């Protein structure tokens, strides 16, 4: 294959490897877009907190949204609540709609939110509506995918996070049949000009999962580093370590969970 990194570790002058625009593979065969985060949640790993993964998503050329390095407003739900979320609706309205789809009351709902000062008002609105909040310090990708996992205990993700993580999550959510809506949130005129330079003129457009990850030829692969809602972290014994991974494909709907032993000696 001939792959091009469309979401990676930064621009060519910011990262020695996996930089945006880097070509990977044999440079022959099918052309692919590659989105990669070799370690999502570096702070979590450094501080022993949960929810760290290594993740890569692929799609045919032109299928993955080439997200600029800025924030997005996000809302994500699982397959059973598909069609109920709306980024333009109020927090209370989204909670009521999703609860109705899931056959729950709003007080039974659990919403995942990143623990950031920018989310203080959002957290207040969720709790005022009667729902519960689950705070995470990091882990936007696994966090957005969590509502699509049947045993995660998470019904919704809400809040503001990085655009690169939104694209990675979009592929995973699409594999699982969930829904994600986002909107770019440039912080100043400089970032707005960056968007215009990229050809993005409708900054206020509500982007669907199909805008972020087009078509069916998409794959999502992740391995857990530290335990999180999606995967277990690495386990060590005296002779080997055990990793837990997931490999998903949109076209076939295949979801494979792998437990692998790696010999250390």
Indicate residue ranges for each PLM-predicted region.
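Solvent-exposed alpha-helices and their adjacent loops that cap or buttress functional pockets
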Residues: 23-29, 46-49, 101-106, 125-128, ...
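Short glycine/serine/threonine-rich phosphate/pyrophosphate-binding segments
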Residues: 38-47, 52-54, 120, 141-145, ...
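Acidic beta-strand-loop-alpha-helix segment within the catalytic core
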Residues: 55-135, 228-235, 241-264
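Gly/Ser/Thr-rich active-site loops/lids in small-molecule metabolic enzymes
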Residues: 131-141, 154-156, 160-161, 165-196, ...
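Flexible, acidic active-site loops/lids enriched in D/E/S/T/G that coordinate Mg2+ and/or position polar
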Residues: 1-61
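Anaerobic metallocofactor- and corrinoid-dependent redox/one-carbon enzyme cores
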Residues: 78-83, 174-178, 182-265
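Short acidic loop-to-helix transition motifs that present clustered carboxylates
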Residues: 11-13, 118, 137-144
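General beta-strand structural signal in soluble alpha/beta enzymes
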Residues: 5-9, 34-36, 45-47, 66-67, ...
